[in-house]
């Protein structure tokens, strides 16, 4: 289960998708107040593109066209801010209103908030071009949500529906609220689109059932295939006990005709894992499927019988080691894995962040060898490990990790009962060839902005509302900037621009205030 920095109630699967589209000046009429765009004098207009949720279909989060480097990063200035208003600005406890990165194509920024509303903005000015209103607050879960864009169409989802919009006008092309059956959870994922197919997944937070991976026809929305991430006797129904699985983050589109998802944990307590141990396939796994048919090619399970919420949920990354295609994987389990992309065979794995000796406890429970004394503290905990996506560039893997142990006071909890220590974070570089740690930089709070490469810099954001850049060679922090609010979403870096969803709750930022917003920073 993706770590929740706050909670949201889920709506039933039968809830209809209610949508309205407001275009240009009409965005101000009726309903919630229109979002507000503010331009700032003295800054260059943003330029460039970030065409996919993680920058490219390989999920590398490396911006080869970026102009920002250590030589000019100090010149970043706020060019514009797009502020959410009304119910979309309220946020949800500590989650905030923006948890997904924007997508930028053709001079337009496409953004989705936590209420599933979609916005199209002019990249140069931040002005609203159109808005697609879903307005289903308090029901779309912890996200990340977000959109994908291809061939003039914007693809998105709410908790129970998927939809396609005209990128030019925001008008609905198709929408389907009948994709998920009872027990298959909700859509939380930022989709991906390639080869005429839209790839989605549901995830599930509690109770029997399980998530499902799927592909839709991009033109019609017709369901092409599904793959259940728990082994069951019916669609998405776990036969081995409580199930979860599903996928939270954008999948990897392979050049070999495959699609790879990182999946979440089985929703089971320590007591259940000890009393009724099972591998719980295909939870906490990399699942490689034929992109056209959904047929399983291979899988790699990181944590069989997981009871500590150690998802392998991060977006997989495609790269090569010595000419061999490789998939880089990671997640809340607190490990980075290099897998042979043809077979799923493990090449290396490296622990990142804080670990306190309980990495093999789920395996011990599987073989009936685990005895636990309470209180029982685990690091990484259910809110720790790798919570945002990684980056790969020039022979290195870049990882942002959260150090936050979780304490269980009894055997019935699934995600732990209380924090087991202070929260902090780390940003690390690993050798792509060997997995060896190249450097490790400590940060005082949670790095949630994902790892993003721009020339000789690595960017991310901290939850308390700070944009930072590190020297890729040494890990030294060479740039810091206070954001308007806290930050709980990956950023985008391209051309002369850094786009930052500063969408956390305004009360939790140190020195920040105002509505959640997307902020564009540019160099001259």
Positions of predicted regions on the chain:
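Bacterial N-terminal signal peptides that target proteins for export
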Residues: 2-16
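Inter-blade boundary loops/turns of WD-repeat beta-propellers
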Residues: 70-73, 123, 167, 218, ...
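Conserved blade-register residue in beta-propeller folds
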Residues: 120, 164, 215, 286-288, ...
